[in-house]
């Protein structure tokens, strides 16, 4: 059944459910039932959603609390720098008895050597004796992800056994974990608990609800068991809680009792009016990331502001970075007000993304008159932009990121940017017309920024005109440049990039080390019957009409392409696979050639990103060429964002 047919059938079934008896509702598939309930609850038609509570339990199980995609991910300070290795006495926790020569070295030298161990080295090390096995585990399990997979369940079982049956004769796996991520993958969960839509479809309604309730209890028990282990992980430094399950008072108590210094709550649903439990003194967090919301089916739904306020009061004395996102409440956003007089003496990094405030007084808590803020990331919400315009210059501010907002206000944000000419990094992810870009960067044909090192701009038009490129080139201090144009989302790529024009216009940027192009597309001289438009370059994957497959396929691959007497359908699939493989390799060769040209123009260039590919510049006394870092394209820009954050956070 096609997608269109399935969607039409679902709509007809929903109409039947809405206009006829309850019996019609019971024959719908679980997906249709949930779709109908979500629609009616959001419209306010279902005034008492508790009557459907067994079925609504599936909402969290199947992640119906919609997670809106980030326009750009926010990197925590702890993620931008590698973890400091633990000393051996903290990992082994007992006197070292191993005779391995490695342990005769000073501890500081051991920590310098271990990063160079390969996976094979670590496997061999684990077989020598107890102490080397614990050292190997400290390298393997410094970062652990619990995602409900079989592997994560084995880790969880091992950690539980260490707590329930402690032994002084055995080293503990729990002592090795520095960074813990809790992120349930729904495919793993559904398979283990047998609640996929296909499995539920064959059950009667009572059996279906019993299966759902059992899965709900299993999920709650799983999350509680993780929280119960946190206090037994003595070296845990970072906790990333990326699970959509409800967050309870008991779970927060366990999190607060742990040794973490950085907490990321990204997506959990707060139970009714959850506040932090009473906690004497402060909570020594250095980094806090909040993207939390109330369940939209909860009749007692309230604002998350009291929860945020209570946690900020505890962490304020030591907090260095605060990230507050409003994506988890996008279905029913509310405006926040923080009436507590909270002071952040060491706060240096603030991110406010899709968070609405009732008034400007709440923002004053994060931007006081006396501040050491170095990095600020905000959208152009009307309240935020007006406050920043009135706030004016922040002498300590080095980095500013301006994201798009539905209630955009450009004039106030531009005024704030102009008030801070000392900026080293400027990221404007909001698409702007070329005239506005010129207004931001220059004044009376002179650059407004003398020390700008990193610049990220997005053109609202389908290309950067020569005048705007000339304006960018006037900022000769630039070392890192990221340009994007046209539509920023979806499959339509509107920027048919002109590399010759860009190289000619920007050649005065002699210190350029990083250059990035996103949403760039290319024209192909393909077959006349094929759609070769740049907008569909990455989707259609059209090859040049004079291209020879022999140049991009191996001998074995060419043999597969030879039309042997095989099934027609299989032959078509095989030819499509080889054609796509050929296109990817041809595309890689084109991007490598362009990047090599850029390295000839910009002699200090070290890294570039174009055509969704990341490349480094390999230089010797004999050559200077671009090389792919990885062969796979990065259409979601995951690797790009990670690299860009590392670079911009270390500018000076």
Model-identified regions with their sequence ranges:
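C-terminal capping region of solenoid repeat domains
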Residues: 59, 189, 197-212, 399-401, ...
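Core solenoid repeat modules with strong leucine/isoleucine-rich periodicity
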Residues: 326, 345-354, 363-434, 453-456
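Short, solvent-exposed loop/turn at the beta-strand->alpha-helix junction
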Residues: 189-190, 220-222, 245-250, 269-274, ...
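A structural signal for leucine-rich repeat
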Residues: 253-258, 276-283, 302, 306-316, ...
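N-terminal adaptor/linker regions at the entrance to substrate-recognition repeat cores
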Residues: 2-7, 30-33, 38, 44, ...
């Amino acid at each position: 059944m096609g997608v269109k047919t399935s969607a039409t059938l679902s709509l007809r079934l929903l109409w039947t459910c809405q206009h006829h008896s309850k019996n019609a509702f019971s024959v719908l598939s679980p997906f249709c039932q949930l779709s109908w309930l979500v629609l009616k609850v959001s419209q306010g038609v279902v005034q008492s959603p508790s009557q459907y509570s067994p079925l609504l339990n599936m909402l969290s199980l199947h992640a119906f609390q919609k997670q809106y995609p980030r326009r750009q991910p926010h990197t925590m300070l702890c993620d931008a720098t590698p973890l400091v290795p633990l000393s051996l006495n903290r990992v082994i926790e007992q006197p070292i008895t191993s005779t391995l020569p490695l342990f005769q070295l000073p501890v500081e030298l051991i920590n310098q050597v271990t990063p160079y161990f390969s996976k094979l080295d670590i496997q061999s090390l684990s077989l020598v004796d107890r102490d080397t096995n614990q050292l190997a585990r400290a390298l393997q399990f410094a970062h652990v992800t619990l995602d409900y997979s079989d592997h994560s369940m084995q880790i969880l079982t091992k950690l539980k056994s260490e707590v329930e049956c402690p032994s002084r004769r055995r080293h503990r796996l729990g002592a090795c974990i520095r960074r813990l991520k809790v992120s349930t993958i729904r495919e793993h969960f559904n398979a283990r608990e047998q609640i996929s839509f296909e499995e539920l479809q064959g059950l009667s309604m009572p059996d279906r609800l019993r299966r759902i309730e059992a899965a709900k209890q299993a999920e709650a028990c799983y999350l509680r068991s993780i929280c119960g282990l946190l206090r037994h992980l003595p070296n845990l430094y970072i906790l990333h809680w990326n699970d959509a399950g409800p967050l309870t008072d008991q779970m927060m108590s366990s999190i607060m009792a742990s040794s973490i210094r950085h907490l990321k709550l990204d997506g959990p649903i707060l139970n009714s009016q959850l506040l932090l439990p009473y906690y004497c003194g402060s909570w020594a967090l250095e980094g806090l990331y909040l993207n939390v919301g109330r369940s939209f089916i909860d009749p007692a739904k309230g604002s998350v502001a009291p929860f945020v306020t209570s946690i900020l009061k505890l962490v304020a004395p030591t907090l260095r970075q605060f990230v507050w996102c409003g994506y988890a409440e996008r279905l029913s956003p509310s405006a926040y007000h923080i009436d507590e007089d909270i002071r952040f003496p060491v706060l240096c990094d603030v991110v406010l993304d899709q968070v609405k405030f009732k008034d400007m007084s709440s923002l004053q808590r994060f931007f006081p008159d006396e501040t050491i803020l170095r990095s600020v990331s905000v959208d152009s919400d009307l309240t935020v932009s007006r406050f920043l315009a009135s706030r004016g210059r922040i002498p300590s501010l080095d980095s500013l990121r301006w994201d798009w907002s539905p209630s955009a206000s450009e004039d106030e944000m531009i005024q704030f940017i102009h008030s801070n000419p000392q900026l080293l990094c400027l990221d404007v992810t909001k698409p702007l017309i070329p005239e506005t870009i010129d207004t931001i960067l220059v004044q009376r044909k002179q650059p407004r920024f003398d020390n700008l090192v990193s610049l990220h701009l997005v053109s609202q038009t389908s290309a950067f005109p020569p005048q705007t490129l000339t304006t960018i080139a006037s900022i000769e201090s630039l070392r890192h440049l990221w340009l994007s144009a046209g539509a920023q989302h979806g499959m339509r790529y509107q920027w048919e990039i002109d590399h010759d024009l860009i190289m000619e216009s920007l050649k005065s940027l002699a210190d350029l080390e990083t250059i990035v192009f996103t949403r760039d597309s290319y024209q192909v001289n393909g077959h006349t019957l094929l759609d070769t438009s740049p907008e569909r370059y990455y989707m259609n994957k059209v090859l040049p009409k004079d291209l020879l497959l022999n140049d991009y396929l191996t001998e074995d691959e060419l043999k597969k392409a030879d039309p042997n007497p095989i099934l027609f359908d299989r032959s078509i699939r095989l030819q499509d696979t080889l054609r796509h493989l050929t296109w990817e390799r041809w595309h890689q060769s084109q991007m490598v050639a362009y990047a090599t040209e850029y390295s000839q123009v910009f002699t200090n260039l070290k890294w570039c990103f174009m055509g969704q590919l990341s490349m480094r510049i390999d230089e010797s006394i004999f050559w200077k060429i671009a090389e792919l870092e990885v062969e796979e394209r990065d259409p979601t820009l995951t690797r790009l964002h990670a690299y860009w954050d590392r670079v911009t956070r270390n500018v000076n």
